[in-house]
């Protein structure tokens, strides 16, 4: 009997040891997987570093590109647009003007009523419509037919007080967020598509002519009399209320910048000189690239698989269309190596490109709850990653911060490059000139962490003394309103050239 008891005890002890060994082994494997996840995070963080010294290198490279772009037509980053003198006279106009805001997955139509010199903007309203994905990769005719139809709906619903008298056409400022040869006239061609568009038959075509044709087919009595770039529109909209606006930056689905330059500093400009002696420069800075940009394997893969590989590199690192996608790619790498750690049955939910949008990333980044509830909900609802631990959510939050911080600090470097080109990057005796930067776009407006990082980074780069003279203002709907304002001043543009 004793032998049986002893034998049973031995067997029981062995079983306990075996279970304990399995538990220890499981914990070791789990610990090992967590270690790999953290290693991926640390590696990504290291490659995304944007020390002040690196940002100053990026700013210097931006300035060099700006000089090159202004020197000859071969420069790709800067192109001369509308004379600055038109903006100072915007307040003189009376009447109702329209603007079409096109360049992302949505487009807007605006109606602006101006009250003249003392009246300012009396009334403004807009309607927004989504562009079906099929039209973003279809034909030019199909896209502009859809836009004209939405324009017609907007006009049909307007109040009687906005109706034009017989014989007078409604006048439209066409605000285009796509890189184009916009000449502040009633013509212009698309240089290349960005922001998810890929319509081959529209490249090189007169987009104003295409829109005009579509409006005629809809029997819409409206004339396009100004083709305006997004940042030029934002600068005009900001200048309407603040005379010190000298720079405009768009941070939305895409990104771009414009600034005020002296005509003498534009060697390639051979046209008439406006009375102000200044011009607005559209930079197309989304297409900026430099060896100093902290690119990672995730950025290279995103670029290679995009509709426009090797183009818009700066935009792909800093704009609302791509930030969430960069995060998704890093999470996919984590999941591939640490599948059990993420409690996932399949990687399929992470395989869909752009399934994780930047607004989702922003919501997670702004989560301050003790258990990071929003992060957990987003992972479950969008990526089908359920039952995540707190440390998993913290890892995701850290990745959000890395992606956003890199983008915001690179934007700050871009602004520093502009200020450097304008000679406003160093303190002046007697006090520095006040410079107002008009900002527009959903990324800047809604992603608070991104906005604060950008502004604080620029302050650090400039130094405390100079930073007090640089002011950021949110020019809400500035680009679209600016397009309407520039349309209103079109006749003055001709007078300035006389």
Swiss-Prot record:
* InterPro entries named among the record's database cross-references: ATPase_NBD, Hexokinase, Hexokinase_C, Hexokinase_N
Regarding tissue, the record states: Expressed in young and mature leaves, stems, roots, stolons, and developing and mature tubers.
Q: Reaction catalysed?
A: a D-hexose + ATP = a D-hexose 6-phosphate + ADP + H(+); D-fructose + ATP = D-fructose 6-phosphate + ADP + H(+); D-glucose + ATP = D-glucose 6-phosphate + ADP + H(+)
Write the record's keywords in alphabetical order, separated by commas.
ATP-binding, Chloroplast, Glycolysis, Kinase, Membrane, Nucleotide-binding, Plastid, Plastid outer membrane, Transferase, Transmembrane, Transmembrane helix
Compartments where located: Plastid, Chloroplast outer membrane
Example GO biological process: glucose metabolic process
* Binding of ADP, residues: 104-106, 253, 442
Query: Which of this chain's residues are annotated to bind D-glucose?
Result: 194-195, 229-230, 256, 284, 315
Please name one Pfam family that this protein belongs to. Hexokinase_2
A GO-annotated cellular component: mitochondrion
> Its membrane topology, per UniProt?
Single-pass membrane protein
Q: What is its EC number?
A: 2.7.1.1
User: EC class of this enzyme?
Assistant: transferase
Segments of this protein annotated with the region Hexokinase large subdomain: 229-477
What Gene3D superfamilies does its record include?
3.30.420.40, 3.40.367.20
Q: Does the keyword Acyltransferase apply?
A: no
Region Hexokinase small subdomain: list its residue ranges. Answer: 89-228
Sequence intervals crossing the membrane:
4-24
- Gene Ontology terms for molecular function: ATP binding; D-glucose binding; fructokinase activity; glucokinase activity
Keyword Transmembrane tagged: yes
The UniProt family comment states:
Belongs to the hexokinase family.
Q: What does this protein do?
A: Fructose and glucose phosphorylating enzyme. May be involved in the phosphorylation of glucose during the export from plastids to cytosol. Seems neither to be involved in cell sugar sensing nor in carbohydrate metabolism in tuber.
Q: Which protein is depicted?
A: Hexokinase-1
Organism expressing this protein natively: Solanum tuberosum
Gene of this entry: HXK1
């Amino acid at each position: 009997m004793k032998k049986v008891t002893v034998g049973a005890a031995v067997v029981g002890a062995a079983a306990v040891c075996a279970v304990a060994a399995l538990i220890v082994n499981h914990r070791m494997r789990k610990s090992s997987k967590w270690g790999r996840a953290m290693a991926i995070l640390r590696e990504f963080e290291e490659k995304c570093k944007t020390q002040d010294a690196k940002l100053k290198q990026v700013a210097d490279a931006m300035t060099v590109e700006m000089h090159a772009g202004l020197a000859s037509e071969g420069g790709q980053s800067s192109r001369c647009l509308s004379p600055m003198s038109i903006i100072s006279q915007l307040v003189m106009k009376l009447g109702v003007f329209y603007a079409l805001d096109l360049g992302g997955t949505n487009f807007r139509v605006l109606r602006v009523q101006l009250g003249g010199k003392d009246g300012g903007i009396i009334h403004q309203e807009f309607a927004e419509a989504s562009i079906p994905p099929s039209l973003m990769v279809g034909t030019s005719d199909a896209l502009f037919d859809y836009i004209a139809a939405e324009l017609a709906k907007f006009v049909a619903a307007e109040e009687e007080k906005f109706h034009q008298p017989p014989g007078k056409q409604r006048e439209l400022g066409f605000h285009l967020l796509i890189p184009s040869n916009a000449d502040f006239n009633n013509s212009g061609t698309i240089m290349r598509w960005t922001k998810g568009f890929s319509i081959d038959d529209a490249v090189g075509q007169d987009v104003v002519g295409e829109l005009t044709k579509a409006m005629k087919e809809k029997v819409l009595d409206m004339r396009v009399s100004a083709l305006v770039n997004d940042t030029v529109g934002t600068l005009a909209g900001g200048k309407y209320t603040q005379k010190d606006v000298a720079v405009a930056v768009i941070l939305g689905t895409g990104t771009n910048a414009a600034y005020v330059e002296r005509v003498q500093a534009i060697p390639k400009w051979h046209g008439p000189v406006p009375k102000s002696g200044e011009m607005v420069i559209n930079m197309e800075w989304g297409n900026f690239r430099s060896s100093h940009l902290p690119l990672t394997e995730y950025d290279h893969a995103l670029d290679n698989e995009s509709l426009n590989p090797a183009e818009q590199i700066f935009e792909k690192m800093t704009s609302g269309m791509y930030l969430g996608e960069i995060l998704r790619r890093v999470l996919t790498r984590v999941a591939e190596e640490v599948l059990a750690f993420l409690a996932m049955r399949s990687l399929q939910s992470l395989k869909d490109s752009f399934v994780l949008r930047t607004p989702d990333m922003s919501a997670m980044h702004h989560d301050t709850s003790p258990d990071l509830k929003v992060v957990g909900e987003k992972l479950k609802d969008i990526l089908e990653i359920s039952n995540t631990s707190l440390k998993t959510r913290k890892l995701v939050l850290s990745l959000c911060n890395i992606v956003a911080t890199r983008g915001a600090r690179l934007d700050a470097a871009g602004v520093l490059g502009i200020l450097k080109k304008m000679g406003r990057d160093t303190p002046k005796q007697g006090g520095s000139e006040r410079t107002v930067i008009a900002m527009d776009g959903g990324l800047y407006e809604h992603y608070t962490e991104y906005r604060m990082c950008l502004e604080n980074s620029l302050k650090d780069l400039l130094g405390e003394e100079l930073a007090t003279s640089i002011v950021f203002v949110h020019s809400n709907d500035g680009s679209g309103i600016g397009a309407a304002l520039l349309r209103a001043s079109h006749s003055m543009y001709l007078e300035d050239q006389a």
